[in-house]
């Protein structure tokens, strides 16, 4: 596999050519970035945790009939995914005021919003991913009106599922980001959820303590990033309950075997 062709490298993942046509291998890196890579560190074990948490969530979405690019996890850091044409938008769903929304509109962080709000951001690091409207999206041809409707419908379904999943383990889903892509199957095309869903792309607060269990720990120099991600994995039933966190990386449950996450 050393000679496999690299298709794309982003801030937190690498895409490689897959074993079959129409597939890719998604590799999760340990890089932690914020503010479009203005802040960057390597955090041992983060990629392993994001791979496992994202696998857990995407498996649930697939079983519920919410279409995604996910096929299966290959190992501790890699997933087999369907190749899609990514729509150049970050789709953000907000349930509670936090981050840029609080700053932009002067709403106190932690305020529950009157209803879930969907926002679109154009994927362009050089421009700091500017917020855009549906008018921008259709005018510049990033997506058609029907595709926007499909993306929004997916975002609402994902939000409903994730809110229940996390609330069931004592975590409040404050907001999250997804990306969507066009999956071509013969003469058919459909919009599917792509990228990842993990504490890197969600704001997750402990219901009882309001502790942050997401990438805000890195953005705000709070420390304890891996420990927070481990706690999310533990509550979701991914981590072995009886295994204490170790400095060399998280210990995770894969099927019936306990395997140790090692940095690549």
Curated annotation (Swiss-Prot):
GO CC aspect terms:
cytosol
Q: Which residues cross the membrane?
A: none
Gene Ontology biological-process entries: 'de novo' IMP biosynthetic process; cobalamin biosynthetic process
Q: Which GO terms describe its molecular function?
A: ATP binding; phosphoribosylaminoimidazolesuccinocarboxamide synthase activity
Recite the UniProt keywords alphabetically. ATP-binding, Ligase, Nucleotide-binding, Purine biosynthesis
Q: Which InterPro entries match?
A: SAICAR_synt/ADE2_N, SAICAR_synt_PurC, SAICAR_synth, SAICAR_synthetase, SAICAR_synthetase_CS
Reaction(s) catalysed by this chain, per the record, are: 5-amino-1-(5-phospho-D-ribosyl)imidazole-4-carboxylate + L-aspartate + ATP = (2S)-2-[5-amino-1-(5-phospho-beta-D-ribosyl)imidazole-4-carboxamido]succinate + ADP + phosphate + 2 H(+)
> What Enzyme Commission number(s) appear in the record?
6.3.2.6
> Mind telling me which Pfam families this protein's record contains?
SAICAR_synt (PF01259)
Pathway field of the UniProt record reads: Purine metabolism; IMP biosynthesis via de novo pathway; 5-amino-1-(5-phospho-D-ribosyl)imidazole-4-carboxamide from 5-amino-1-(5-phospho-D-ribosyl)imidazole-4-carboxylate: step 1/2
The record ties this protein, via SUPFAM superfamilies, to:
SAICAR synthase-like
Which NCBIfam families does the protein's record reference? purC (TIGR00081)
Q: Which PANTHER family match?
A: MULTIFUNCTIONAL PROTEIN ADE2, SI:DKEY-6E2.2
Task: Tell me the protein family, please.
Answer: Belongs to the SAICAR synthetase family.
What name does the UniProt record give this protein?
A: Phosphoribosylaminoimidazole-succinocarboxamide synthase 1
User: What organism does the UniProt record list as the source?
Assistant: Mesorhizobium japonicum (strain LMG 29417 / CECT 9101 / MAFF 303099) (Mesorhizobium loti (strain MAFF 303099))
């Amino acid at each position: 596999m050393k000679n496999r062709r690299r298709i794309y490298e982003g801030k937190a993942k690498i895409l490689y050519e897959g074993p079959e046509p129409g597939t890719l291998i998604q590799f999760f890196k340990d890089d932690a970035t914020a503010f479009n890579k203005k802040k960057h560190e390597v955090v041992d074990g983060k990629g392993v945790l994001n791979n496992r948490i994202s696998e857990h969530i995407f498996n649930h979405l697939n079983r519920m009939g919410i279409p995604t690019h996910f096929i299966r996890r290959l190992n501790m850091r890699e997933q087999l995914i369907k190749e899609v044409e990514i729509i150049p938008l970050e789709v953000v769903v907000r349930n509670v005021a936090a981050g840029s929304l609080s700053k932009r509109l002067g709403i106190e962080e932690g305020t529950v919003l009157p209803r879930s709000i969907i926002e679109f951001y154009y994927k362009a690091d050089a421009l700091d991913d500017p917020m855009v409207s549906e008018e921008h999206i259709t005018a510049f041809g990033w997506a058609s009106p029907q595709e926007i409707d499909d993306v929004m419908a997916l975002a609402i379904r994902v939000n409903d599922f994730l809110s229940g999943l996390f609330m069931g383990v004592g975590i409040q889903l404050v907001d999250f980001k997804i990306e969507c892509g066009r999956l071509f199957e013969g003469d058919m095309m459909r919009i599917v959820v792509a990228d990842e869903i993990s504490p890197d792309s969600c704001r997750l607060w402990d219901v009882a303590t309001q502790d942050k269990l997401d990438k805000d720990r890195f953005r705000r120099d709070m420390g304890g990033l891996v420990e927070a991600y481990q706690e999310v994995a533990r509550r979701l039933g991914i981590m072995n309950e009886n295994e204490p966190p170790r400095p060399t990386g998280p210990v995770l449950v894969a099927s019936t075997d306990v395997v140790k996450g090692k940095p690549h």
